[in-house]
């Protein structure tokens, strides 16, 4: 059974995308099509902030792209040596909060110790931070242009200072239409389509509706989390599956249940 995932491929240590591998364990043939591209912004300013950990109570990373922005800052400004020598240790003396295991893995690669990765989404991370944070200094939050206000609002309501800096913007992947056309012409209508963000839904839904035609009612739509599920529902699409956590294992389990007769998760 063929399933379509609207995300870019990420190879793990085994040289395979973990989503393809996990779905394959259930006999599902997954194809990945990227729908988003990212452009980095304000890196000199972000680099300067990373150079002054004494000004902040800690860091918040809620997306892999924000971590990539930090990596670029270190590479482009010849800060790798000073990062390894002193900055990394100073940041590790503070809290580094993250959402999800994928983001946590990237943060650990630049030498930072993380906490909160099991929270899974911004709402739960906000609760976690509020239960622990006592520093009078602001938390530094590198984010994208489409960031939601749940985390900033929750922290503000609890009197926890936070300083946001937009370090990337989300744009449509230039190959969306062509890649979807190729997929449908070669594979036909998939049994399931998974969306990984509201913006990914925005950029791809029209093409999917046109290509699926009357067969769109046969597709089981899945979401990686509650925010994306709400975006699907707002477009009038039935959500057959919302992953219990943003992991390949949880999504594969959910899709398998949704594709079983009368299945729903």
From Swiss-Prot:
What EC number(s) has UniProt assigned to this enzyme? 4.2.1.75
Q: What is this protein called?
A: Uroporphyrinogen-III synthase
- Kindly give the Gene3D superfamilies that the UniProt entry links to this protein: 3.40.50.10090
Whose protein is this, by species?
A: Homo sapiens
Stored PANTHER family: UROPORPHYRINOGEN III SYNTHASE, UROPORPHYRINOGEN-III SYNTHASE
Q: What is the effect of changing residue 127 to A?
A: Does not affect enzymatic activity
- Chemical reaction(s) catalysed: hydroxymethylbilane = uroporphyrinogen III + H2O
Q: Which UniProt keywords apply?
A: Cytoplasm, Disease variant, Heme biosynthesis, Lyase, Porphyrin biosynthesis
List localization entries.
Cytoplasm, Cytosol
Function, as annotated: Catalyzes cyclization of the linear tetrapyrrole, hydroxymethylbilane, to the macrocyclic uroporphyrinogen III, the branch point for the various sub-pathways leading to the wide diversity of porphyrins. Porphyrins act as cofactors for a multitude of enzymes that perform a variety of processes within the cell such as methionine synthesis (vitamin B12) or oxygen transport (heme).
Q: What, per the annotation, is the impact of changing residue 227 to A?
A: Does not affect enzymatic activity
């Amino acid at each position: 059974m063929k399933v379509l995932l609207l995300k870019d491929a990420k190879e793990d240590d085994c040289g395979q995308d973990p989503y393809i591998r996990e779905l394959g364990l259930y006999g599902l043939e997954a194809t990945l099509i990227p729908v988003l591209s990212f452009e980095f912004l304000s890196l000199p300013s972000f680099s300067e902030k990373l150079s002054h950990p004494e000004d902040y109570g800690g860091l918040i990373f809620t997306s892999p792209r924000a971590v990539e922005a930090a990596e670029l800052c270190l590479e482009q400004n010849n800060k790798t040596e000073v990062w390894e020598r002193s900055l990394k240790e100073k940041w590790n003396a503070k809290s580094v909060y993250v959402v999800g295991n994928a983001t946590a893995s990237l943060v650990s690669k630049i030498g930072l110790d993380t906490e909160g990765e099991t929270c899974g989404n911004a709402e739960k991370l906000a609760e976690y931070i509020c239960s622990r944070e006592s520093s009078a200094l602001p938390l530094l939050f590198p984010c994208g242009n489409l960031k939601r206000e749940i985390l900033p609002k929750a922290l503000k309501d609890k009197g926890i200072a936070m300083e946001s800096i937009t370090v990337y913007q989300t744009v449509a992947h230039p190959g969306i239409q062509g890649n979807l056309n190729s997929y449908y012409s070669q594979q036909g209508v998939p049994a399931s389509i998974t969306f990984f963000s509201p913006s990914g839904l925005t950029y791809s839904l029209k093409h999917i509706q046109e290509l699926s035609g009357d067969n769109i009612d046969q597709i089981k739509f899945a979401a990686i989390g509650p925010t994306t599920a709400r975006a699907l529902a707002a477009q009038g699409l039935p959500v057959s599956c919302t992953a219990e956590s943003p992991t390949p294992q949880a999504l594969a389990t959910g899709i398998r249940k949704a594709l079983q007769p009368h299945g729903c998760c």
